[in-house]
Amino acid sequence: MSKKTDTPDYKPSIYSLTRDELIAWAIEHGEKKFRASQIWDWLYKKRVQSFDEMTNISKDFIALLNENFVVNPLKQRIVQESADGTVKYLFELPDGMLIETVLMRQYYGLSVCVTTQVGCNIGCTFCASGLIKKQRDLNNGEITAQIMLVQKYFDERGQGERVSHIVVMGIGEPFDNYTNVLKFLRTVNDDNGLAIGARHITVSTSGLAHKIREFANEGVQVNLAVSLHAPNNELRSSIMRINRSFPLEKLFAAIEYYIETTNRRVTFEYIMLNGVNDTPENAQELADLTKKIRKLSYVNLIPYNPVSEHDQYSRSPKERVEAFYDVLKKNGVNCVVRQEHGTDIDAACGQLRSNTMKRDRQKAKVGR
């Protein structure tokens, strides 16, 4: 039976250590600082998946590493490849729980969407991620491991492709797992490791205003996206429970603080739900809402991926999206209709995991 705990009882991944933590651990166990640098190089540049592959590390120290850590804690369960090059992965954690990761081919390179929690408690009424409530947070090693396994998938193909961008937009609310997400960001951004540029990394939040303020003061130069999805409190509270705790006034005060502190642009994610939030009046409300920060904000209009459990929602027709877009553009709003990826596979975030868990339960019943 899967353990439902934020402190799982299994050997940690070495990916959970920052470079400084790995150096401290090596010194504590009788090695020199350079030994940690060698291990770091094996992990993130040579991208080995076992300590035994580290040929310049002594057998005794490899035994110590094996005693205390694993390299990658994830097991690949399912891989779905789309005709457009999108790849969706279902990974199994050491405690048997399942998470999703998505690789998207963009014109600028390979972008990976990572998951930060097992399940989600935010409660957006249109989203597949919240079909299963939060079981636990992922530790930063389990988040990093997603990137490493996706990169391994492409390394084995011998095409020389490299993960160049990361979006922290998978299952879960990243700012509800703040400490682990922050360590993950610093690990993948480390110049001595994967060296993924901060401006190639985007973190998305449903709107935890106090965490947006905290994030503004961290000094990390990654991009921030806010899942907005509605232009007024009444509508947003009806489809996003988080708005009852952090209404738009509080959220936008935090966003303004973030922009003033970092001088960085904020992206607003807006899923187009037919007959719900997609009228020209809604578009005008959105334009008015973002007017004060227009120069440093951007709106992503997102086609909805239908979820069978949320059949009260459907995708806005193309003409409604175009009319909405036109109102925004007339008001000087920087906006784009997001390109779709993986429409021929379990495309909605959380859908592959949900469908697999259903099949697993059905098999278990048959086997009784």
From Swiss-Prot:
This is Probable dual-specificity RNA methyltransferase RlmN. GO terms for cellular component: cytoplasm. Its main location: cytoplasm. InterPro entries: Aldolase_TIM, Methyltransferase_A, RlmN_N, RNA_MTrfase_RlmN, rRNA_lsu_MTrfase_RlmN/Cfr, rSAM. It is an enzyme of class 2 (transferase). The active site is at 100 (proton acceptor), 349 (s-methylcysteine intermediate). Specifically methylates position 2 of adenine 2503 in 23S rRNA and position 2 of adenine 37 in tRNAs. It holds the Pfam family Radical_SAM. GO terms for biological process: rRNA base methylation; tRNA methylation. It comes from the Bacteria. Belongs to the radical SAM superfamily. RlmN family. CDD domains: Radical_SAM (cd01335). GO terms for molecular function: 4 iron, 4 sulfur cluster binding; metal ion binding; rRNA (adenine(2503)-C2-)-methyltransferase activity; rRNA binding; tRNA (adenine(37)-C2)-methyltransferase activity; tRNA binding. Residues 106-344 form the Radical SAM core domain. S-adenosyl-L-methionine binds at residues 172-173, 204, 227-229, 305. Transmembrane segments: none annotated. It is found in: Cytoplasm. Binds 1 [4Fe-4S] cluster. The cluster is coordinated with 3 cysteines and an exchangeable S-adenosyl-L-methionine. NCBIfam families: rRNA_mod_RlmN (TIGR00048). Its cofactor is [4Fe-4S] cluster. Keywords: 4Fe-4S, Cytoplasm, Disulfide bond, Iron, Iron-sulfur, Metal-binding, Methyltransferase, rRNA processing, S-adenosyl-L-methionine, Transferase, tRNA processing. The lineage of its organism: Bacteria, Bacillati, Bacillota, Bacilli, Lactobacillales. Its EC number is 2.1.1.192. It catalyses: adenosine(2503) in 23S rRNA + 2 reduced [2Fe-2S]-[ferredoxin] + 2 S-adenosyl-L-methionine = 2-methyladenosine(2503) in 23S rRNA + 5'-deoxyadenosine + L-methionine + 2 oxidized [2Fe-2S]-[ferredoxin] + S-adenosyl-L-homocysteine; adenosine(37) in tRNA + 2 reduced [2Fe-2S]-[ferredoxin] + 2 S-adenosyl-L-methionine = 2-methyladenosine(37) in tRNA + 5'-deoxyadenosine + L-methionine + 2 oxidized [2Fe-2S]-[ferredoxin] + S-adenosyl-L-homocysteine.
